[in-house]
Amino acid sequence: HDIFKYVCDDIRPSERSIQRYRREYGNYFEVLLQMTLKKAFDEGFTEFNHVAIDGTIKKAYNSNNNTITKKETQILVDYYEGRPIDPESLEKLHKPAQRLLEKKDMDDEDKLELLYGIETQFTFTGQDRIPVNDIEARFMKGKKGNYMVAYNIQSAVDYDTKLICAINVTQNPTDHYELPNIAERAIRNINTKPKYISADTIYLNQISLSYLADKKIDGLIPNRKQSKEKIGKLNPNPYHKDHFEYDYELDAFKCPEGNYLHFFAKYIEPHKDPEKPDKIKRLYNNYEACKHCPARNKCCSSPQTHKTITEYGSEMQKAMNQKMEKQEYKDEYAKRSSVEGPFGIFKEQFQIEKEVVIGMVKTEERINLDALAYNLIRLYNIKQEIENTTEDLEDFCES
């Protein structure tokens, strides 16, 4: 690239120099990302009205087999702390633990420090195995159903410009409760609150909704049925819950035969994680209607005498469900499909899966560098598109 050659006096830096640059200046990449967003705002390219939240996973620099158990960790800690160890227990260690034991380019103090770090991760996560090469990475489920040692990459993207507004790397294996953190980061980077924040169904929970309400941001998060309906994947069984229509005024479900199942009970289901809000379960049925319904055998399984609909969610979730039934919000939410491109570019052109980075902080710094490069290219392209459009318009008027 001509600019690169000019700045570097036509000298290509070594890979070691590039790695050192990334290591020493990593904490500045997000600041530079903020500058690209400010430039877009100052140029009038966007006002950040609609920011879309999404998540993906990035494979860590650690194979699935290169992990160590809690028992093996304790054996090695005892060994390096000088406690008596049965030689047979050392011989029975699995290969990753054996490799650590036999590692020649690492002194005992460094090995012990690594093992202490692994012990901390066991306490912090509750997992039964910890990756040895990247102890902060976690086993996560990929889109193909396979598990891999990875990081959860959360992103926020502006609809108008497709610029990346924020990146947040986490250890959580799912996206459920990630919206507040990535949204807060995006607001800090764009220096304003967007009118809309959209997200997939997996983000629909009390924590996300409370955050959006507190920030007075118009959230756009469909429920599972609305998402399935949008892509035409409702359950083919005509008597499945997907085909029971909820009446918000009556607080009742209308069944395919035209009868209403009314609310009759609410239960609080404690969350497994005490720091997360309890789940609210609402039950609906109509025993008399089901008793005399000619379609009961098609709708209910053989032991059932009547149909019961179970619905999860608070009043805030009901309000979100009702809002997402309105066409104006469906149209606004439909825009998010066009902002899912950056990570496709990351994986195909930037080859982020091949990047050798270890640790959560360093992974986030590297993804921020990728996001910075993406935003700079995107800004250039936006400016070129505007200039070309202006030239075409001038040529048309002159002709």
Predicted regions span which residues?
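A detector of single, family-specific signature residues
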Residues: 2
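Anion-binding and metal-coordination hotspots
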Residues: 6-399
